[in-house]
Amino acid sequence: MTEAVETETVEPTTDEATAADVEPREPVYIDRPIQTVGRRKEAVVRVRLVPGTGKFNLDGRTLEAYFPNKVHQQLIKAPLVLVDRLESFDVYAHLDGGGPSGQAGALRLAIARALILVQPEDRPALKKAGFLTRDPRAIERKKYGLKKARKAPQYSKR
């Protein structure tokens, strides 16, 4: 008994094909640091983008030291990865208020806004990915007569 051995040619998926076909982006020259602000929840982040090697300095700490959560790190790097500029700029940021999630969202918004000032033709891609939208959700205030914003005390009929 002989079995026919079929050889399959594996076509690259669209993601692999586009990643292989993407030409390396030419370096962008900026004459001064780009400064932007991002906000989310109670967090406010001021960012300075300068030409460099992809280093993050967040209040004097590295990205990994300030945000140990890998999800937050990916969230922050997403705009730079999208426009293929992860190793083109150094990011210096001052973070105020909020918690880790709010600060990460504010930092992502500030970086995306800075990238537009550097290269305006990147705007449609950043806009489509949702990186330029300021998330308006914030904590709802507590109302008197209630235990929390919407939680009412237990009701007793008799």
Curated annotation (Swiss-Prot):
What keyword terms does UniProt attach to this protein?
Answer: Ribonucleoprotein, Ribosomal protein
SUPFAM superfamilies named in the record? Ribosomal protein S5 domain 2-like
Which biological processes are named by the entry's GO terms? Answer: translation
> In the UniProt record, does the keyword Glycoprotein occur?
no
PROSITE patterns annotated for this entry? RIBOSOMAL_S9
Entry-linked Pfam families: Ribosomal_S9
Could you confirm whether the keyword Iron-sulfur appears in this record?
no
Where are the compositionally biased (Low complexity) regions?
10-20
**Molecular function (Gene Ontology), one example:** structural constituent of ribosome
Name any GO cellular component annotation: small ribosomal subunit
* Annotated stretches, region: Disordered: 1-20
Matching NCBIfam families, A to Z?
PRK00132.1 (NF001099)
Q: Which family does it belong to?
A: Belongs to the universal ribosomal protein uS9 family.
What protein name does the entry list? Small ribosomal subunit protein uS9
Q: Which species?
A: Mycobacterium sp. (strain KMS)
